[in-house]
UniProtKB/Swiss-Prot annotation:
Phylogenetic lineage: Bacteria, Bacillati, Cyanobacteriota, Cyanophyceae, Synechococcales
Source organism (scientific name): Prochlorococcus marinus (strain NATL2A)
GO molecular function per UniProt: ATP binding; glutaminase activity; phosphoribosylformylglycinamidine synthase activity
Record-linked CDD domains: GATase1_FGAR_AT
This enzyme's EC code(s): 6.3.5.3, 3.5.1.2
PROSITE patterns (UniProt xref): GATASE_TYPE_1
Protein name stated in the entry: Phosphoribosylformylglycinamidine synthase subunit PurQ
Pathway: Purine metabolism; IMP biosynthesis via de novo pathway; 5-amino-1-(5-phospho-D-ribosyl)imidazole from N(2)-formyl-N(1)-(5-phospho-D-ribosyl)glycinamide: step 1/2
């Protein structure tokens, strides 16, 4: 198993993810600069949090044109696993690999806190270590984490069992309390909470470990 972490100018959670995957789980992990186009040899790709290109225009709007993301589309089509965390989730929606959009938080402020979450679907390969309706708590840190979509898209997400996580106490105004979604095939997961910040036993917080430990099987 080999993991690639895509790094953009402005990414700042790439090393956190590497510590979680390689330091805590022992999975070989490499950084992939946004200009690369070669994803051969990787079993899963993570797009980490941060402020790609300074979040100018809107979150992920510039990053979605990076050369590596053209290769990512082919990677997904072939069944490759992709996880987008926070800014990574925003990029996946801009790229069209996930539906909907992430907009300014309802209170118009940056939120740095913990969020109680409910597991709504285990369809995604990333979620298979949970059971439906499990309760977990993960850190959140975002200014534009309010998930929005049309009524048609919402119905499709629900019909396809693609709502992966919901907030127990919605912190940002996301429609239907949505904190994370998956694509129809289940190999792409986008989520605003940060599982990589809840993987280290030394911190006494490992609720996110079950997501990343799917890389071990």
């Amino acid at each position: 198993m080999n993991i690639g972490i895509i790094v953009f100018p402005g990414s700042n959670c790439d090393r956190d993810v590497r510590w979680a995957t390689e330091g805590c789980l022992g999975v070989p992990t490499s950084f992939l600069w946004h200009e690369t186009t070669d994803l051969d040899g990787f079993d899963a790709i993570v797009i980490p949090g941060g402020f790609s290109y300074g979040d100018y225009l809107r979150c992920g709007a510039i990053a979605r044109f990076a050369p590596v993301l053209n290769s990512l589309i082919s990677f997904v089509d072939k069944g490759g696993k992709v996880l987008g965390i926070c800014n990574g989730f925003q990029i996946l929606t801009e790229l069209g690999l996930l539906q909907g959009a992430l907009t300014r938080n309802k209170n118009l402020h940056f939120i740095c806190d913990r969020a109680n979450l409910s597991i709504e679907s285990t369809k995604s390969t990333w979620m298979k270590n949970y059971k439906k309706h499990d309760s977990i708590s993960l850190p959140i840190a975002h200014g534009e984490g309010r998930y929005q979509c049309s009524s048609d898209v919402l119905k499709k997400l629900q019909d396809d069992d693609s709502v992966a996580l919901r907030y127990a106490d919605n912190p940002n105004g996301s429609i239907h309390d949505i904190a994370g979604i998956t694509n129809k095939k289940g190999n792409v997961l986008g989520m605003m909470p940060h599982p990589e910040r809840a993987c280290d036993d030394a911190l006494g917080d490992i609720d996110g470990k079950s997501i990343l430990s799917t890389l071990l099987s």
